[in-house]
Amino acid sequence: MMMMNKLLDYLDYLFPNPKCELIYQKDYQLLMAVVLSAQSTDKRVNSVTPIIFSKYPTLEDLKKANLSDLEEIIRPVGSFRKKAAFLKGIATRLFDEFNGVVPIDREVLESFPGVGRKTVNVFLGEFYGVPAIAVDTHVERVSKRLKLAYLNDSVLDVERKLMKKVPKDRWARFHLQMVLFGRYYCKAVKPLCKDCPLKEFCREKKKNLD
């Protein structure tokens, strides 16, 4: 418990007002940006989404988009063929079945092309303020380094353990803080361990401080 309190205090110190770094204006734009961010970076996603939503300003436009044209725009984020098809599929369902509004129901959202549990957690937490902890690569890495989860735990295992340890009213905020902490401090390569007050709890402190 002491470790968790120290982590929460440190995250509040580093990121008192954490913000999602994906650029969006509408609900479906956020959902699509999160889908595009899989196995990519927010920076790359932010380089293509303004182009997408400028060229295709409505869901109907995206639904009718030429797939090859959309693929070329999305190419920088990786897996561009698959992701272009996901975006067209999402636009089509939202336009045809939901009057252009992204549903808040988790099961319905997870039935959309390219939308899994992590994407739903990010979307619901960011857009609607629904308590959720989305476990992306940063959250998973930091959690395992700080022994909040076992090294062989699945993403779902990590999520469930964090939900038990973190107060529910902090879940969405905690997710954003952990993403930023993993992105800028507890990095996959060359983490900034020297001055980290959490290193006493870290599995990798010896390796990264030697």
Give a label for each model feature.
Residues 3-210:
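Catalytic cores of DNA base-excision repair glycosylases
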